[in-house]
Design a protein with these regions (language model features):
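Extended ligand-binding clefts on enzyme/binding-domain cores
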Residues: 1-41, 45-131, 139
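CBM-like carbohydrate-recognition segments
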Residues: 93-103, 119-129, 135-226
Length: 226
C-alpha cells in the first residue's frame, strides 16, 4: 500500500521519495515492471491468507497497459540492459510483443559467448543481468537461448560456487580482462543464477514464478475504485 501511495495519476509508480516525503518527478520502466509483478504475487498470497486485495491486481493491470502501450510514460533509461528485458521477465510483455522486444535489444546489449552488458556503451558483462535475461527469454518461450545465456555465466563461477559480479571484456585483444567491481562476488548475482537455473530446468515449484501468469484464487472479486 505504501508503494501504491506513490502512484501518479496515470498509474505509474514514481521511483523514489525524499526523506521529507517529497516525491521524485519520474517513474522507471524497470521499477514499474518489478512492481507489477510484485503486486500480482502479493495479491495471490493475500488470497491464500484469506485477505483478498483485488485493488493490487487492478493497479498491476494499469501498469501493464502503460508498459505495453505507452513507454513514453517512463524516464528514458535505454542505456541500461534492465530496461530492455525487465518488461518481458516480469510478465508485462508477452507473446509476439515479448519476442520482438528481446530481439530488438539483442545486438545492443549482448556480447556473443560472453553475456549481457550492464550498459550498452561498456564492455562490462554481469552475471546477474545475463541470468535475468535468460529468465526473460524463458518467459518468452525461447528456452534454448535462455540455456545458452546461462551457460555464458560460467566464466564468472568461482571454485567455491559463488559468482563474480562482472567481467570487463576489452574491445582491444591486447588488453587484460578484469573483474568489475574488483573481486566482488555478490549475493544478488548468486540469486539471479539460481532463479534462472530453476526457471529453465523446472526444478522446483517456484520455477514458474517468472514464466507463467500469477493465478489468483479470488480473481472474481472487484477492486475498489482507484
Amino acid at each position: 500500500n505504501w508503494v501504491l501511495d506513490m502512484r501518479r495519476e496515470d498509474g505509474a509508480v514514481i521511483w523514489a521519495r525524499e526523506v521529507d516525503s517529497q516525491p521524485w518527478g519520474y517513474a522507471l520502466l524497470t521499477g514499474c515492471s518489478s512492481i507489477r509483478h510484485a503486486l500480482r504475487c502479493g495479491a495471490a498470497l493475500a488470497d491464500l491468507l484469506g485477505d483478498p486485495q483485488p485493488e493490487w491486481t487492478s493497479a498491476a493491470d494499469v501498469l501493464d497497459r502503460l508498459i505495453t502501450t505507452n513507454l513514453e510514460a517512463f524516464e528514458p533509461k535505454e542505456r541500461w540492459a534492465m530496461d530492455w528485458y525487465y518488461p518481458v521477465m516480469t510478465g508485462a510483455m508477452t507473446g509476439a510483443q515479448a519476442k520482438a522486444r528481446l530481439a530488438e535489444g539483442w545486438d545492443r546489449f549482448v556480447l556473443d559467448d560472453r553475456g549481457v552488458r550492464c550498459v550498452n556503451d561498456e564492455q562490462w558483462v554481469t552475471a546477474a543481468e545475463t541470468s535475468e535475461c535468460a529468465i526473460a527469454h524463458c518467459a518468452a518461450g525461447d528456452r534454448d537461448i535462455a540455456r545458452e545465456l546461462l551457460l555464458w555465466t560460467m566464466p564468472h563461477r568461482r571454485e567455491d560456487g559463488a559468482y563474480w559480479t562482472g567481467i570487463v571484456y576489452p574491445a582491444e585483444p591486447e588488453k587484460t580482462i578484469v573483474r568489475f567491481p574488483a573481486d566482488e562476488y555478490s549475493a544478488y548475482t548468486a540469486a539471479a543464477i539460481i532463479l534462472a537455473a530453476d526457471a529453465i530446468s523446472g526444478g522446483s515449484p517456484a520455477s514458474t514464478l517468472f514464466t507463467q501468469p500469477i493465478v489468483r484464487k479470488n480473481a472474481h472479486l472487484k477492486a475498489r475504485a482507484l
